[in-house]
Amino acid sequence: TCIKQKKDRWAVRIKEMAEEMPDCGESEIGWRVVRKLSVEAAKQLEPIFEEHKGRNGRLSIQTDPRLIRSTQALVDQAVEFSELAPNIIVKAPATKAGIAAIEEATYRGVSVNVTVSFSVAQAITTGEAIERGLKRREAEGKDVSTMGPVVTLMAGRLDDWLKIVADRDQLFIDPGHL
């Protein structure tokens, strides 16, 4: 959306980046654009972040979905993204590798937003991983006061899919149940 809204600016910059990095593919160039856009957007939110002492004014950046099975790759990217600006919160998936990454990233000072969480069990498990990461930080005397971890239970996404399936298969589901 941001690139479409400022197409004149970003089309030129993306072309320049592609020329500057001839060995990089579209994906790497795309992630570099994400980083640049994120830094700019985070800067716009900094006054809110400062006013609310780190509790509001955060910008979410999604980790690369292709890393979903690699704990270390998710941790590395989460740490990298968190260092782009003080008010970054990093989205990480509630997968087996993601949950381990969430604990480690939290320990390293990354504020996380857990995504791909569709069940209460996932929410509890990721909440426990966040707590372990925070406790490890505190045990070493590291600050946790401005960290703002979030677990997003994505029930709405599941409801959207169930509505599509119900329409496709001509199933009647009481609207009160979706």
Q: Model-derived features: where do they sit?
A:
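Residue-identity detector for threonine
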Residues: 1, 63, 71, 95, ...
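Active-site beta->alpha loop and helix N-cap motifs at the rims of alpha/beta catalytic domains
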Residues: 2-101
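Short acidic, glycine/serine/threonine-rich loops at helix termini
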Residues: 4-7, 71-75, 100-107, 124-129, ...
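Structural preference for beta-strand elements that scaffold enzyme active sites
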Residues: 56-60, 87-91, 109-113, 146-152
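Charge-rich, low-complexity amphipathic helices
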Residues: 63, 67, 103, 127-128, ...
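Basic (Lys/Arg-enriched) interaction patch that binds polyanionic ligands
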Residues: 92-122
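Catalytic alpha/beta core domains of metabolic enzymes, predominantly
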Residues: 111-178
